[in-house]
UniProtKB/Swiss-Prot annotation:
Name of the molecule in the record: A-type ATP synthase subunit C
Keyword Lipoprotein among UniProt keywords: no
Complex and partners: Has multiple subunits with at least A(3), B(3), C, D, E, F, H, I and proteolipid K(x).
Keyword Membrane among UniProt keywords: yes
Physiological role: Component of the A-type ATP synthase that produces ATP from ADP in the presence of a proton gradient across the membrane.
Subcellular location: Cell membrane
Protein family membership: Belongs to the V-ATPase V0D/AC39 subunit family.
SUPFAM superfamilies: V-type ATP synthase subunit C (SSF103486)
GO cellular component: plasma membrane; proton-transporting V-type ATPase, V0 domain
Organism listed in the record: Thermoplasma acidophilum (strain ATCC 25905 / DSM 1728 / JCM 9062 / NBRC 15155 / AMRC-C165)
InterPro entries membership: ATPase_csu/dsu_sf (IPR036079), ATPase_V0-cplx_csu (IPR014272), ATPase_V0-cplx_csu/dsu (IPR002843), V-ATPase_V0D/AC39_subunit (IPR050873), V-type_ATPase_csu/dsu (IPR035067), V-type_ATPase_csu/dsu_dom_3 (IPR044911)
UniProt keyword terms in alphabetical order: ATP synthesis, Cell membrane, Hydrogen ion transport, Ion transport, Membrane, Transport
Pfam families noted in UniProt: vATP-synt_AC39
Length: 356
């Protein structure tokens, strides 16, 4: 235990009571009108988020942005109470939202969309993306990028932050093929490389967090491989989407990828992740998302309980951050399922339920 965490731990313990319970999630699942879900959120911990955005946005964008904003508010609680030794690790982790926002901007530019179409998808707080809390990209940066003439100009702009320099190695391929996916994959590799480095040189109580991150890399790689197998893409061509640093090494992933099809890949992964249930659902529906959700739940079950039991440590901070992320995922899934008239059983299959 580390006494420098006492202040942050006490503050976060108070705010943990605001996370929705399984019973409250079930209440929202039973609703049929998205307006009822919005009202439920507004009458709970999300009122401030709605009030700050309602003058500019209307549903469904309003509720999506309120959910994003609330998660960022929770992350601010962590950042403002963080012990000095934990700062690099937490900031490195939270830069994932810079990565997601950059992907949104590049994809919007690729599709010919402007800032108005892209803005609802940016994870922001009072018009300030989370990255500004970590000392990187501001909302003005995102507006500048979306107004640039092309993707190459965006990469040049990002060079000052490190992201663009790393992505430049894929620029020539993009010019030849018009395919932006290698660039987007490179952002994930850049993110995890920096995160693992920040955790590797911490102080010794980061093992659950480090194992969580390595398992999340596994998840990304497994999902990429399953997509590649369905599309019949050779491993070498798909390798730009494979991330180093997971529990399953790249050579082992290559061996597994030589399996006949997606079902065989899932079987070959059994020693790492039991994917029998999502495999059955995939065979019934053809939907690969079952694997992603199943692995997310497996990882949450393996590590979040342990993090919650290590109160004065880096793990306690990450437990709160990850609970906030899971709630964001679940609330967005429930709300958008109501907007799109999705059956409850499908909605439930998309939820991360292990820590509710």
């Amino acid at each position: 235990m580390d006494s420098t965490y006492i202040g942050s731990y006490g503050r976060l313990r108070v705010y943990q009571t605001e996370f929705f319970s399984r019973q409250q999630i079930d209440q929202m699942l039973s609703m049929t009108d998205p307006k009822d879900v919005s009202a439920f959120l507004y009458n709970g911990p999300y009122r401030e988020d709605y009030d700050s955005l309602s003058a500019v946005f209307k549903d469904p964008d309003l509720t999506e942005m309120a959910i994003n904003r609330h998660m960022v508010r929770n992350n601010r609680l962590v950042l403002f109470a963080i012990p000095p030794l934990a700062k690099n690790a937490v900031v490195a982790y939270l830069s994932k939202w810079d990565i997601e926002n950059i992907k949104t901007v590049i994809s919007a530019k690729f599709l010919g969309h402007g800032i108005r179409e892209a803005e609802p998808f940016l994870v922001s707080f009072r018009d300030i993306p989370l990255g500004i809390m970590s000392g990187t990209l501001t909302n003005e940066d995102y507006r500048n990028m979306i107004n640039l003439p092309n993707i190459e100009a965006i990469l040049n702009y990002l060079a000052r932050f490190g992201y663009g320099t790393y992505m430049m190695q894929f620029l020539e391929d993009y010019r030849k093929t018009g395919d932006i996916s290698p660039m987007l994959y490179s952002l994930d590799r850049y993110y995890y490389m920096n995160l693992l480095s920040a955790l590797k040189y911490y102080r010794g109580d980061e093992a659950p967090v480090l194992n969580y991150v390595r398992s999340d890399i596994d998840r990304q790689n497994i999902v990429t491989m399953l997509k590649g197998k369905v599309l019949k893409i050779p491993f070498e061509r798909m390798s730009s989407g494979i991330i180093d640093g997971g529990n399953i090494g790249v050579n082992r992933l290559r061996e597994i990828y030589s399996s006949q099809d997606a079902v065989s890949v899932a079987d070959a992964l059994k020693q790492y992740y039991d994917l029998e249930e999502p495999k059955k659902k995939y065979m019934e529906t053809g939907d690969l998302y079952h694997f992603d959700i199943a692995i997310r739940n497996i990882i949450a079950r393996r590590f979040l309980d342990t993090m919650s039991m290590l109160p004065l440590s880096l793990d306690s901070l990450f437990y709160f951050i990850l609970r906030s992320e899971i709630e964001r995922h679940n609330l967005r899934t429930i709300y958008l399922s109501k907007v799109n008239g999705m059956p409850r059983e499908i909605t439930e299959s998309l939820l991360i339920t292990e820590m509710m």
